[in-house]
Design a protein with these regions (language model features):
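Periplasmic c-type cytochrome electron-transfer domains
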Residues: 1-169
């Protein structure tokens, strides 16, 4: 958590705003609580997508329907499940291709994923699957922030998890 605190502390405006809410400042407990409170705002029980799932076929656009069809076609719901479309399991990154070799960056402690907590070798490079509700608001993506856009993240997931190179739009 020291790396996270150091990174956050670099943004002086963030620190001022954070300290207004958490007077005892940046620490693991407060950061974890802030993330939990933020995640509560991501639930959208009556979104257009929810209405579509409940049978209102005109609630989303034709492009959005096509995207959802691809989501199902490529079995994204295998990991992105439940009301928030994820957040319920830890999965390995790089099932089909070596994400870390391709990234061409020095390995960090955070790259170990769940292993950092469990020390179980099976958890090395295993990360919590993010929920997809309001995901467009949470860039950059991946545990290391290496994917700047949703398009980058989707293409990377297709490559590293499924072994598929998605065509350009």
């Amino acid at each position: 958590f020291d790396q996270i605190i150091s990174k956050l502390a670099e943004d002086k405006n963030f620190v001022v705003a954070f300290n207004e809410v958490y007077p005892d400042g940046l620490n693991e407990k407060n950061i974890t609580n802030a993330i939990q409170e933020f995640e509560k705002t991501l639930l959208t029980p009556n979104s257009r997508f929810d209405r579509y799932l409940k049978g209102q076929k005109d609630a989303i656009t034709a492009d959005e329907i096509a995207g959802y069809d691809l989501f199902k076609k490529y079995d994204c719901a295998t990991c992105h499940v439940g009301e928030i479309l994820g957040g319920q399991s830890y999965e390995l990154i790089g099932v089909q291709h070596d994400y870390f070799a391709d990234r061409q960056a020095e390995m960090t402690e955070e790259d170990n994923g769940r292993f950092k907590q469990t020390k179980a070798e099976r958890d090395r490079h295993r990360f919590k699957v993010p929920g997809l509700r309001n995901i467009e608001l949470t860039a950059p993506y991946f545990h290391d922030g290496s994917m700047a856009t949703m398009d980058d993240a989707v293409r990377a997931m297709a490559k590293y998890q499924l072994g598929i190179d998605l065509p350009q739009p």
